[in-house]
């Protein structure tokens, strides 16, 4: 189940807001410019589906999203607990960073935490299968799928060079552990 927890950025122990209500999640996130939607997962994907098969299965949805956002490319990130780069990628994603474009993700399977840091607050959006999240350009954030990641997500990019992060150097993510 998807959840949203909002914290004062000086107090990781006591959420100011905790909800699993999709409408409230969307409203709270919209207030900081983040798009959040729950979609009925429109396509059944085999566990061993290739990235190309996943992109093709979701093509109508991708075309619509790419048209809305002006995106020029899409790819699939597929993480499993035995992925050879799981630890390395987790460490990279865990560091607070920004992008110069919106970060748009749709969870095909599995889950992960998108954590945004702005205006003295930390917004932990735990996204699950069927969730669409779009984090605006230049929003400080990090991502955590835990030490045993297991998810498939569509990633949509305006910049055709793909995922390009600009790390802030802020160590706040270490104070806000969100996944085991």
Curated annotation (Swiss-Prot):
Binds 1 Fe(2+) cation per monomer. SUPFAM superfamilies: RmlC-like cupins. CDD domains: cupin_ARD. The record marks 105 as: Important to generate the dianion. Fe(2+) binds at residues 97, 99, 103, 141. Pathway: Amino-acid biosynthesis; L-methionine biosynthesis via salvage pathway; L-methionine from S-methyl-5-thio-alpha-D-ribose 1-phosphate: step 5/6. Its EC number is 1.13.11.54, 1.13.11.53. It is an enzyme of class 1 (oxidoreductase). The record marks 102 as: May play a role in transmitting local conformational changes. Ni(2+) binds at residues 97, 99, 103, 141. Belongs to the acireductone dioxygenase (ARD) family. Monomer. This is Acireductone dioxygenase. The gene is mtnD.
